[in-house]
Amino acid sequence: MADSGSNEEAMKRQAPSVKFDSPSKPDPQQVSQQSNQLSSQKSIQQSTQSKIDPSRIDTKNTTVTTTRPTLDTPPEEEEEKRDGFGNSFEFVLTSLGLAVGLGNIWRFPTRAYNNGGSAFLIPYLTCAFLFGLPAVYFEFLTGQYQGKSPPVIFRRVRPILEGVGWMGVFVAALVAIYYIVIVSWISIYMINICRGHFALWSHCNNDWNNGTSCITMADQYLCKNHTKVMANSTLWNSSLPIPDKMVYFNGACQDANGTDVSTATEQYFMTYIVQPSSGMLDFGGFNWPVFAAMSVCWLLTGLGILKGAKIMGKISYVSVLVPYVLVVVLFINGVFQDGSGVGLEMYFGTPNYTKLYEQDTWTEALKQLCFSLSVGHGGLISLSSYSPKRNNIFRDALIVIIGDTTMSLVGGGAVFATLGYLAKATGQDVKDVVKSGLSLAFVVYPEAMTRMPVPWLWCFIFFLMLFLLGASTEIALVDVFCSCIYDQYPRFRNRKWIVVIAWCSVLYCIGLVFSTRAGYYWFEMFDEYAAGFSSVCTVVCELLVMMYIYGFRNVRDDITEVVGHARNKFTGAIGAHSWYFTANWMVISPSIALILVGLSFVREYPYMGRHDIYPAVFDIFGWFLSFLPVIIVPIFMLLNFIRCRNRGHSYRTLFMLQKQHASYRRIAANYSKDQLALQDQLPDKEPWDEENVDLTDSESESRNAASGDVPIDDVATIDTSSTYHQVY
């Protein structure tokens, strides 16, 4: 009877960390004394007896000593503290909002056109299978299983590697700083469309036009296609008053003095909207319309993340679903325009398979995929941490990949159908009107829209779609850092406005340089350097840490906990449990990412070959931005060494799996005696749990009872011969 009583009492005090005390049977008198002590602490008994998990007892030995539970909070309490999406559909929509962005509309179409047309889909879809889907699936798994932000996740794997989690956070911050500039330009276009400017940007009779260098697109066509050859140029003596002479030289129209001329829509964007100075170091004062637009956009971004994941999920119904509707509307409208067939044929119908043998084609496919999916930005991990732990992440990863690719294909179709119409209307070939990047969105497409019936409507629909795509991505990027602060400083969960205002203000102040007249050149620097190299480095580090340090077998066990066991051999072979993903995360994806890292060093110096506009400081500061997230890793290594010393813990704990990790109990159940003996060195709380509150003894006891923590001095011996036991 004494043994039975001791078993019952011990089962109530079961903890995840176990160590061997002695091979002898427990003394009944000691057990009785401990029982009396436990009976005087009724509140602690009631809270802890439901936390027992006999699966963590080693059956090879008869007596073990247990210590306090090691999870910081029980799962049910943690879910109450941390925000979450209303349902899995909202999580998918918000993830799509981060992945599907402006690059799907203005980068993908021109990259596809320049790299083989429809043949570009072969390397793009191949890279999506080899890199895109595994990367998204991996980041969803990492975030959802732990239910924490990236720095906390990697700190729990090994505290010394906390900086790996911060890498993606800083990449997201760098992208958010300049990404909102594009959203600001788009918002200015939307406002000006409502003011009637859609009828003004297609001709040269406006105050902002340079009368000596402004031409219409029709004039540009005449300049470019005149047959009289003169050396390396073509001279056209126009009967029009402006310009009276133009030369087509080295790919651009020039006037008689050798000055480049530009179309009316180009001048509207560059002269009226951007208002650039002579170079990146010539700041020239503020561009007040851009300054005002940025201020409003930052205000809207702050409001979008102020209420957390639940509100973000609701916003995604509009910011994500509406762009899909609008892009279909634009595609249908473009298809029914005269000349659209020529544009669609250039995009879909004329594959150039010889491009598949060129390295640049595959490189461009990889770059487009990385930028489009936002892998390595910390955002996908952060968003998935708000998702329920049993959510089907493999299904969601497939949806994100399919949704992103669909937007690229349909958006590209809408763009090229419209370009075909514009080429027919101006008497040019499609190749003559194709532009890349910003020019496609802010110059060529508006030019085409003004020639359609009801031009203001189509212009507004196009820029509204861009605004929603950009805003949804910006909100997700800014929220990444805020999530990290909420996790490491829980007291701010109920005062989120402090974190949101502070973080948005910091990014806003840094981004003020974009609202100067040199802002366009600084934007180009951020766009060129901020995300590519650093995001790929982040992916490599995350994969290496999780697959080789945390362990690929543990990752596979995490998958089983999240999505359950494979239903049959077929789903086990190609589904969430497929060994393909394990091999991919260990070898294929890191190799692909390292190739991208190497290729990122191959670029033109100076940028665009214009040392007068882009001096050496452009590339120097650009590379500093690229390496900034990487520098974060050793900085946090040093900080954790200092933190460990100040807390009086052994430095060995910096290289050990922490008790707060979601799989610690499962993994510790298989530890050897020597490994179990080392677990006592691990801290029972996160550093921020010790620093954030100063509790009295009674408050501490109450909190321990609520969280399932038992005072470290209270131990109980357990007879593992009990039949109430199973191996995990």
UniProtKB/Swiss-Prot annotation:
Residues 106-119, 184-285, 336-364, 418-451, 517-531, 600-616 are extracellular. Na(+) 2 binds at residues 99, 104, 372. The keyword NADP does not apply. This is Sodium-dependent transporter snf-5. Disruption phenotype: Impaired capacity to form and maintain dauer larvae upon starvation. RNAi-mediated knockdown in a pept-1 (lg601) mutant background results in a reduced number of progeny. Dietary supplementation with glutamate does not rescue this phenotype. It is found in: Cell membrane. The chain crosses the membrane at residues 85-105, 120-140, 163-183, 286-306, 315-335, 365-386, 397-417, 452-472, 496-516, 532-552, 579-599, 617-637. Disulfide bonds join 204-214. One of its GO terms (biological process) is amino acid transport. Na(+) 1 binds at residues 97, 100, 469. Residues 29-50, 60-73 have a biased composition (Low complexity). The lineage of its organism: Eukaryota, Metazoa, Ecdysozoa, Nematoda, Chromadorea. Sodium-dependent amino acid transporter that mediates the uptake of the L-enantiomers of various amino acids, including L-proline and L-methionine, and also of acidic amino acids such as L-glutamic acid and L-aspartic acid. May additionally have a role in potassium-dependent amino acid absorption. In response to the availability of amino acid nutrients, may play a role in dauer formation. May play a role in promoting fertility. Residues 1-84, 141-162, 307-314, 387-396, 473-495, 553-578, 638-728 are cytoplasmic. InterPro entries: Na/ntran_symport, SNS_sf. Residues 1-84, 687-728 are annotated as: Disordered. One of its GO terms (molecular function) is gamma-aminobutyric acid:sodium:chloride symporter activity. Keywords: Amino-acid transport, Cell membrane, Disulfide bond, Glycoprotein, Membrane, Metal-binding, Sodium, Symport, Transmembrane, Transmembrane helix, Transport. One of its GO terms (cellular component) is neuron projection. Its main location: membrane. It is a multi-pass membrane protein.
